[in-house]
């Protein structure tokens, strides 16, 4: 343990400060495809009974009309976050009729690209803009890639904790700048160590053969309809997913907030030749919002993002620049197909400890060589993380994954102890023990467990459909309370009314609306 981490832990362990760790906030976003009872992509519109995908706070769509996204609020206890996520699932299942929620991250057998429906958000200008943005994603990356689902884990530490540490360390930055710098330092450490999360929680070692759609790849055939890599942990996070030459130059090393926002400013304002050639329109039909490297900031694909809640009409870069970093969004977590929610409480407890470790441990700037090694380690683990004797790069030297993983878990142990002291019980130590067991025995990892079942003769699709049916039974077995049901019904009703109100307002010319939106991007790109 570094001296800096020891000092910070000792300070937070003082009786007057211990309660601060109970004020961390959590939120979860879970994506999942709607499928029919045969495991085929549901081509039906977003169910109106779920409310408006444009305005509902908890239930929306991601890329496709068939790709649901469930969003929790924030809570200090991840158990409450998961309870809310579960209630959203139960309400959704009540409205899905005979449809199912697909259990893994990698999609079901997909129809041809033209048939995959892009999400629609109504006739308002903002609704149409969201649709055109998704048309641009299809043009740039293909629809198939947009059907991959994941879990996003949002996490923040209380401002009082940052202020306490700033005072004790004699830092003279503004409170906002210090907090932002500490979150960016957390992200640097996350880049160093996130390969560990892929080993422990990666759950996508195989996929439906049709996913590759004839594109070249290095995957092996497990059966007539399943492709895999024998030691993979997360094909979802491998380079078979978002292969974007346009984004290849966008690899900020997160040495400060300004360098991150500057790289995004440049990307949203710089034309990319292939996109320029395609153009923004074909006749009167919009193809993409613009021809820049990124149409909007959120198009940038990364395993973690610094975030700040935006005001109405405000862009993410503007929020970060004017008010600093508020929380981080972890975006690399696979959906665990063995779990109804795709994530459980022990995993959430461990991620809390892991992120707290990243926040409190010393985090030197990432030099270019180390930045590249972080990317290389991550890609190596997602494609062959369970390979016996696999070595990674640490400080320019080779180290066995198992050795480094064991060392990291030992370094996280004091964080788990501190969290348990703060909150009572031993839930974090128990969550850590589960992860130590996976390092000791690779067969306990979710990716190994998926392949163990597939090797018994099930195809990826058969396995995924079986899990989806089991989870549907779980959610439908216990209905919501009358009070919860009424709250969800009201939220759905209110969201539809809000969309209708938006669409009833005079909206002006859509081309002018997009031009104004583009002008806001250009204003950022300075």
Swiss-Prot record:
<comment type="pathway">
    <text>Sulfur metabolism; glutathione biosynthesis; glutathione from L-cysteine and L-glutamate: step 1/2.</text>
</comment>
<dbReference type="GO" id="GO:0006750">
    <property type="term" value="P:glutathione biosynthetic process"/>
</dbReference>
<dbReference type="GO" id="GO:0005524">
    <property type="term" value="F:ATP binding"/>
</dbReference>
<dbReference type="GO" id="GO:0004357">
    <property type="term" value="F:glutamate-cysteine ligase activity"/>
</dbReference>
<protein>
    <recommendedName>
        <fullName>Glutamate--cysteine ligase</fullName>
        <ecNumber>6.3.2.2</ecNumber>
    </recommendedName>
</protein>
<dbReference type="GO" id="GO:0046872">
    <property type="term" value="F:metal ion binding"/>
</dbReference>
<keyword id="KW-0547">Nucleotide-binding</keyword>
<keyword id="KW-0067">ATP-binding</keyword>
<dbReference type="InterPro" id="IPR007370">
    <property type="entry name" value="Glu_cys_ligase"/>
</dbReference>
<comment type="similarity">
    <text>Belongs to the glutamate--cysteine ligase type 1 family. Type 1 subfamily.</text>
</comment>
<dbReference type="Pfam" id="PF04262">
    <property type="entry name" value="Glu_cys_ligase"/>
</dbReference>
<dbReference type="InterPro" id="IPR014746">
    <property type="entry name" value="Gln_synth/guanido_kin_cat_dom"/>
</dbReference>
<dbReference type="GO" id="GO:0005829">
    <property type="term" value="C:cytosol"/>
</dbReference>
<dbReference type="InterPro" id="IPR006334">
    <property type="entry name" value="Glut_cys_ligase"/>
</dbReference>
<keyword id="KW-0436">Ligase</keyword>
<keyword id="KW-0317">Glutathione biosynthesis</keyword>
């Amino acid at each position: 343990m570094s001296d800096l981490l020891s000092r910070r832990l000792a300070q937070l362990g003082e009786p007057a400060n211990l309660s601060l760790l109970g004020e961390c906030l959590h939120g979860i976003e879970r994506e999942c495809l709607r499928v029919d009872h045969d495991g085929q992509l549901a081509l039906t519109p977003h169910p109106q009974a779920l409310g408006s995908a444009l305005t509902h706070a908890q239930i929306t769509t991601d890329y496709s009309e068939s790709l649901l996204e469930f969003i929790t609020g924030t809570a200090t206890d991840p158990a409450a976050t998961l309870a809310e996520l579960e209630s959203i699932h139960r309400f959704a299942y009540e409205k899905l009729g005979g449809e199912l929620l697909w259990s893994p991250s990698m999609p079901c057998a997909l129809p041809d690209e033209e048939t995959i429906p892009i999400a629609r958000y109504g006739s308002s200008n903002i609704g149409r803009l969201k649709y055109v943005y998704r048309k641009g994603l299809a043009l740039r990356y293909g629809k198939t890639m947009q059907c991959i689902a994941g879990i996003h884990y949002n996490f923040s530490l209380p401002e009082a904790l940052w202020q306490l540490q700033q005072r004790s360390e004699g830092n003279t930055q503004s409170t906002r700048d210090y907090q932002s710098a500490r979150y960016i330092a957390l992200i640097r450490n996350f880049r160093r160590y996130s390969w560990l999360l892929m080993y422990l929680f990666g759950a996508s070692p195989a996929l439906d053969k049709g996913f590759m759609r004839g594109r070249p790849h290095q995957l092996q055939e497990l059966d007539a309809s399943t492709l895999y890599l024998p030691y993979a942990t997360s094909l979802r996070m491998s380079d078979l997913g978002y292969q974007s030459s346009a984004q290849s130059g966008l690899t900020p090393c997160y040495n400060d907030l300004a360098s991150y926002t500057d790289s995004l400013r440049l990307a949203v304002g710089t034309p990319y030749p292939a996109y320029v050639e395609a153009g923004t329109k074909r006749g009167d039909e919009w193809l993409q919002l613009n021809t820049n490297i990124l149409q909007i900031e959120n198009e940038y694909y990364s395993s973690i993002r610094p975030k700040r809640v935006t005001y109405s009409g405000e862009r993410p870069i503007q929020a970060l620049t004017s008010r600093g970093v508020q929380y981080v969004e972890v975006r690399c977590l696979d959906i665990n197909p063995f779990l109804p929610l795709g994530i459980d409480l022990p995993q959430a407890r461990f991620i809390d400890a892991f992120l707290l470790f990243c926040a409190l441990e010393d985090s030197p700037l990432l030099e270019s060589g180390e930045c590249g090694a972080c990317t290389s380690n991550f890609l190596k683990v997602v494609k062959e993380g369970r390979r016996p004797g696999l070595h990674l790069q640490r400080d320019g030297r080779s180290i066995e994954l198992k050795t480094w993983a064991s060392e990291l878990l030992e370094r996280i142990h004091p964080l788990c102890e501190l969290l348990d002291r703060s909150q009572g019980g031993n839930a974090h130590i128990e969550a850590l023990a589960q992860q130590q067991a996976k390092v000791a025995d690779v067969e306990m990892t979710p990716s190994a467990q998926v392949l163990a079942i597939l090797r018994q003769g099930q195809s990826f699709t058969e396995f995924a459909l079986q899990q989806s049916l089991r989870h549907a039974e779980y959610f439908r077995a216990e209905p919501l309370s009358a009070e919860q049901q009424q709250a969800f019904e009201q939220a759905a009703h209110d969201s539809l009314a809000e969309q209708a109100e938006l669409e009833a307002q005079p909206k002006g010319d859509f081309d002018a609306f997009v031009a104004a939106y583009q002008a806001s991007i250009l204003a950022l790109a300075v």
